[in-house]
Amino acid sequence: MANSTFSGPIRSEDTFKTVSKAASTGTITEIITLGDGPVTLGDEDSTLTNATHSGRLIVVPAITANRTITLPSPVAGSHFKFIYGGAAEETENLIFDTGADANYFIGGVVHADSNADNVTIYADGNSNSKLTLTDFGGMEINIMAKDSTNWLIW
């Protein structure tokens, strides 16, 4: 793949995609799509893909039961930003799952604590592959692949 240098603005009438290429196989993997509008998930368990979801705002709707959002295999630089698009506090749980226990979260989550115990939410950096939001009423969660194994979360 050639390198290009641009000295002025770059324009796309659709989107920009960043990709990675496996040195051994030549396989191209889409990492982030820039320029597309938000993606609204349905009221069901969801499995994300880099090509469809990375680099785009992901809106989680009001949910009627516990729901799991499963991340794709991590590709360094892929980024998922989630916000809540419902109108009221949920009584169900929303679970973010890395898809494998060997792929864990690193980082912490800032949150509004409704029961005043002021507990900090953070991953231990060696085993937390799931994050569960319980009775949430609003959220903004960012998850980015640190490398091909782990996810940064904030």
Which sequence ranges carry the predicted segments?
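Solvent-exposed loop and beta-edge segments used for protein-protein assembly and interaction
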Residues: 6, 74-76, 135-137
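Contiguous ligand/interfacial binding patches
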Residues: 114-129
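Low-complexity acidic/polar repeat-biased segments
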Residues: 128-154
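Residues that act as N-cap/strand-start positions at coil-to-secondary-structure junctions
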Residues: 4, 63-65, 137
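Short solvent-exposed loop/turn micro-motifs enriched in small/polar/acidic residues
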Residues: 3, 124, 134-136
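Long, leucine- and charge-enriched amphipathic alpha-helices
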Residues: 2-3, 11
